[in-house]
């Protein structure tokens, strides 16, 4: 049996950051024809759910264990969103400066890069491309506060399924 090696030089990896986000509004045919740069992304959180074990018994013993389907859920946090995202978030411009909320939400895709690093090359090791598809925005809270002596930009938290 081969001896296990731990903490080898160049084999201690990590992942960090979120950058170069792209929105892909879905067209009526179900395709994603055009990507739009999304500036101001502060976080992209992936929260899968499901995949629960379902034990089955026969002859007084555990016969098998079936695993349920996994569902993807994610949250995008950003200082702003591109104008093209408004339709995906249930907003429609009805006149200059007037927006109607609670409209039908357009499905979309989303992509972003995260940095891959290791103990020898640091953050220059590489990157990972994350692709989300079939997303639909869910309503989320938005707070508007008065400007004061320590203002903070509004941070949108957009929940997607």
Region roles according to the model:
Residues 160-161:
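Conserved small/polar residues in nucleotide/adenosyl-binding loops
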Residues 16, 30, 49, 100-104, ...:
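Alpha-helical protein-protein interaction elements
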Residues 43-50, 128, 132:
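Membrane-targeting and insertion segments and their boundary/processing signals
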Residues 154-157:
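Terminal interaction module
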Residues 3-9, 62-151:
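Extracellular/virion structural assembly segments
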């Amino acid at each position: 049996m081969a001896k296990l090696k731990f903490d080898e030089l160049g084999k201690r990896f990590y992942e960090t950051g979120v950058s170069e986000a792209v929105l892909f509004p879905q067209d009526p045919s179900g395709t994603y024809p055009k990507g739009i740069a999304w500036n101001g992304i502060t976080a992209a959180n992936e929260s899968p759910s499901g995949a629960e074990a379902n034990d089955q018994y026969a002859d007084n013993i555990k016969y098998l264990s079936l695993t349920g389907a996994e569902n993807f859920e994610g949250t995008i946090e950003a200082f702003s969103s591109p104008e093209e995202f408004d339709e995906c978030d249930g907003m429609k411009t009805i006149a200059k400066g007037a927006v109607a909320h609670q409209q039908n939400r357009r499905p979309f895709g989303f992509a972003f890069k995260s940095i891959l690093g290791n103990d020898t090359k640091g953050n220059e090791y590489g990157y990972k491309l994350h692709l989300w598809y079939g997303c639909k925005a869910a309503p989320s809270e938005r707070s508007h506060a008065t400007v004061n002596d320590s203002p903070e930009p509004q941070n949108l938290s957009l929940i997607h399924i």
